Amino acid sequence: MDNSLKTSVMIIEDDRDFRELLEGIFERSELFDLVGSFNSVEAYGAEMLKNKPYVSWLPQLLVVDVMSSKDPRQESASFISALRSEGLRFATLFVSSMDFGALLRVLRKSHPHGWSSLQKTSRLTEQDIVEAAVSAFNELRSI
């Protein structure tokens, strides 16, 4: 399939095993084009600063572990929300071992569309991940 027809995706995940699992899922998918993978929001931010204009570098979808910062006092949701507040437009799929429905409700107050979330559990399937990614992207695209 022509990559120009696929949704571009980047991953920010500090757990190497889970990051590799996500990379495999998005590489195998006919719907997505994996264009980057990072082990922390700091690594993502550093790479982003090297790639101006940001709007042409950003993917259409970011898959982000909520706690993927190297600083335990930080979390990635604030970083992602700040990027959106600057007018950057991309869908976001949050993944975490925590249940964070309340966090999504807060994020939706300032940026209502393009969010999805998944809780990391032993029952999480490849289909669950792809469906949540598609849902986040379609929600943002529909506005």
Where are these regions (language model features)?
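Conserved phosphotransfer microenvironments
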Residues: 41, 57-86, 99
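Short, aromatic/basic amphipathic alpha-helical patches
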Residues: 22-26, 79, 104-110
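Two-component/phosphorelay signaling modules centered on CheY-like receiver
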Residues: 7, 16-42
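The C-terminal output helix
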Residues: 127, 131-143
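Short alpha-helical segment
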Residues: 41-50
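Short, glycine/charged-rich "phosphate-handling" switch motifs in NTP-dependent
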Residues: 115
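A short, hydrophobic beta-strand element within the central beta-sheet of small alpha/beta folds
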Residues: 62, 81, 88-107, 118-119
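Conserved acidic carboxylate
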Residues: 13
